A protein has these predicted regions:
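Charged catalytic cores and adjacent phosphate/nucleic-acid-binding surfaces used
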Residues: 1-91, 161-173, 277-385
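A metal-dependent hydrolase metal-coordination microenvironment
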Residues: 85-266, 270, 300-312, 332-339
Length: 385
């Protein structure tokens, strides 16, 4: 470990005392004989003003490194020791569920991206209702800008006769656009040009895939219904999903999750405890979905500030975990305005531990459960996972 002051104030050229203490092992005043995770060193600055010592951290977790000159503590740093599973992974903060004015949000896609980068986000996907192209619009808007924000394609998937909200994060083609005569309409596309954005620009991002060659063939609504009904025959759907409407919805969810994976994306089951008159989904439907988990990740924290959504979803997550069901989780704002005066703009986020801040590495890390969902409703963040 090398410690070097960055300012003009340097270490005195005398011997310093350095202590290392593991946060998990209790205070040395109360437990003076507990040696594991606690150590003491003597060091004098070298010709470059650097204090150096060598320590083999015995435990995973947080450590305090404290430096003393005589009896005065002059510096404290926190460091983390990790096991091999976290070695090389860098924590990244982001959002997997956001809206712009292209559906029912307020700001342009590029404004949403800029606002979340200003807040410190490392990655995001714009996931407008029914629409894939706004996420490409956000990416295209910064094609000539050197920036550190990773933007991936995304959409909130709303297929006919399925009222469950599903997020496609990072998919290479649109799931919504697999059905003919769906959003966006030609009139919507025709209205996209504006000052600084030409028709030629629009043609490069108003697409239904990252590369148009990746687009699967479209189908009619009736063809979609037939595919879902055929899939439903192969699923062991229990009696608790007790009518044809719900049975179709569950089968449609499985079909959509499969299609998102076919698009090389991450399939997210979103906010079952969102209150839309009543809870969006019945308790039995939510229970079965979480226990079967045909999705890739559960949006355990979503965009509402009332307790019944995030509180109930968190309780449900820990309850099913205690029963032996395990699945990846994420947290997102589901924000419809990215301006800081919107109280819901930063209510939740996800910390992911990928090897790289890029689409596939983020997806793999989430699938492998290297995530923490962060509730930002209060000043003091609360963590889930």
């Amino acid at each position: 470990i090398n410690v070097k002051p960055r300012g003009v104030r340097q270490f005195s050229n005398v011997e310093h005392r350095i202590t290392v203490s593991a946060l998990s092992e209790g205070g040395t005043r109360c437990f003076p004989d507990r040696k594991i995770g606690n150590a003491e060193f003597k060091a004098t600055p070298d010709e470059n003003g650097v204090l150096s010592f060598t320590y083999d951290f015995p435990l995973e977790g947080e450590y305090f490194i404290r430096i003393f000159n005589g009896d005065s503590r002059i510096l404290q740093h926190n460091v983390f020791a990790v096991n091999e599973d976290l070695a090389g992974r860098i924590p990244r903060i982001g959002d997997l569920h956001l809206h712009s004015c292209r559906s029912d949000g307020r700001e342009l896609p590029e404004t949403v991206a800029a606002n979340y980068r200003a807040f410190g986000y490392d990655f995001l996907a714009l996931t407008d209702h029914h629409r894939y192209y706004p996420s490409l619009e956000a990416i295209y808007s910064y094609k000539d800008v050197d920036h550190a924000l990773t933007m991936v394609p995304g959409e909130e998937v709303h297929m006919s006769r399925n009222f469950v909200h599903i997020i496609s994060f990072g998919g290479k083609f649109s799931i919504n656009a697999l059905i003919k005569d769906t959003f966006p309409t030609q009139a919507e596309i025709d209205n996209l040009p504006r000052p600084g954005v030409t028709k030629e620009d629009v043609a490069k991002f108003a697409l239904r895939a990252i590369n148009e060659s990746d687009c699967p063939e479209q189908m009619t609504h009736q063809e979609f219904y037939a595919k879902v009904e055929e899939l439903a025959k192969t699923l062991d759907i229990p009696d608790c999903i007790n009518n044809d409407v719900e049975r179709f919805m569950y089968a449609a969810c499985v079909w959509e999750f499969n299609k998102i994976r076919e698009a090389d994306g991450l399939a997210i089951f979103a906010h079952p405890y969102w209150i839309s008159d009543m809870f969006q989904l019945s308790e039995s439907f939510t229970d079965y979905m979480l226990k079967q988990h045909p999705f890739d990740a559960f949006e355990v924290l979503g965009g509402e500030r009332y307790y019944e959504q995030n509180g109930f979803q968190t309780a449900k997550y820990y309850s099913t975990r205690s029963e032996g069901y395990d699945y990846p989780i994420v947290g997102s704002t589901d924000s419809h305005s990215s301006n800081s005066e919107n109280a819901g703009a930063y209510v939740a986020r996800t910390m992911v531990f990928p090897f790289e801040n890029e689409r596939k590495s983020l997806i793999n890390a989430i699938k492998d459960k290297y995530t923490v969902a962060i509730d930002g409703i209060l000043a003091e963040p609360r963590l889930v996972g």
